[in-house]
Amino acid sequence: MTCGPAYESVDGVRRLTNFATGEIGTILSAAFQEGGYDVVCFRGEGSTFAAPTGVGLQSFSTNDSLARALRSLPRQPDLIFHAAALCDFKIVAIEGSDSKEKISSRSGGITIHLEPAPKILPELREWFPQALIVGWKYELDGQRSDAIASGAQQLRATGSDVCVVNGKAYGEGYGILRRDLSLRHCQDKKSLALALMEILAKNEKSTSAH
């Protein structure tokens, strides 16, 4: 389980990050643990929601640190649920200051150059070929149909098995979108956890049958 925010360091005391709290990943980690699964929760250092108990915990800072942590897992997981709010952009240059420790406001204005950051979700299929891979699509703009379309695009682009769609565009609750584009609506986090455990159980049964 990945959750919470990543960050990009501007200098030794400032960061570019987001408002993710780690709540959904924490709640789902606890639910899967209660369901009998061995859970490792990778939480962004900036997570503010209380950490789950009874599960393995690893913290991460940047996109790269999460990637390294995932690749160092000692065994292949049955499921990867990637809900971490990673940085969409990385800092490639800062003009106007040479300081790495703390940029002084006395130096005047600075210009921060950003470029798109590599995504982790598209790499997960190669890293974990046998795992059920669940991504996350949080959409603010548009209607529910737009959010679902974005989720479908994610499934096609990343090779993941499931996409959980939510946000203002989707509306209340969560949508579980499968590769066949079937959609299951979950009213709350508890029903989402139960639905994901059901999907995992069916996937395990199908895999063992082969």
Label the model's feature ranges:
Residues 2-210:
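A cross-family phosphate/adenosyl-ligand binding-site feature
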